[in-house]
Amino acid sequence: MDHETIGSEDWEELILNLEATIPVYDRINRFATIGQVDKWRRMVRERLPSEDAKILEVGCGPGSFAEDVSGVDLVCLDPSVLMLEAAKPRVNSKRQERGESEVEFVQGKAEELPFEDNSFDGTCSLFSFRDWYDKRAGLGEVIRVLKPGAKVVIVDPAKINRIHGVLGWLWMRVWVGAYARIICGVKDHPWKWLTKTYVTFGTTRDYVRMMEDVGFENVSAKVVFPGMATIWEGRKPES
């Protein structure tokens, strides 16, 4: 496991641990981000096309972001059937309340997106990119399915440098770990595995370079308050 790839055995174990977070996912995520996660999700929505657009969320999890996305044709992809089963009623009930069409839920991996070239007006990934088993391959697939000129927006933990990374690890390992242990009621809680993926996650700059390497233009990275997350953006070239 390194900043680009996760081995197949590790990835399968990671998926099992992610599925174990479903009952308390939002509660612990809100605690881990000091209540900022909803603000970050709003920032992503503001960066994506908002009218008559077709948007793909890669790694939708239990639907925490998708439930508040409105005015667009939304497709949610996740490798976990259990995540999709949790997300579908949650998201589509909100869509029905707003008089919108249901979201399309698709099981699949970022590295093998089951969509045709130039299919989407925008893509996003929130707290999922870190868990892709091959980030470079996944970004290559994202740029393939985007329409020319369309944008990808990614949110995941910030790691400005080694010192910042150590502080982030301490936060995840000690503070969030203690809270997760209380909420989950077990010592061997699934957030231990998520801390492991944070350790091997690269720096903010690593993924700027990676996005540029696979062909994205106008790539930017913004570390957002309180220094716990990064928002990466990039556009597919017009031609």
Locate the predicted segments by residue:
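N-terminal, positively charged/glycine-rich alpha-helical extensions of SAM-dependent methyltransferases
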Residues: M1-V24, I183
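C-terminal alpha-helical "lid/dimerization" subdomain adjacent to the S-adenosyl-L-methionine
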Residues: S8-E12, V155-M210, S220
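Conserved alpha-helix/loop element of class I SAM-dependent methyltransferases that forms part
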Residues: T33-E51
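Class I SAM-dependent methyltransferase SAM/SAH-binding core
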Residues: L56-E112
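A short SAM/SAH-binding and catalytic strip from SAM-dependent methyltransferases
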Residues: D121-D134
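A short glycine-rich, Lys/Arg-flanked "PGG" loop and its adjoining helix->strand segment in the class I
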Residues: R136-K151
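Core SAM-dependent methyltransferase catalytic element
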Residues: V214-S239
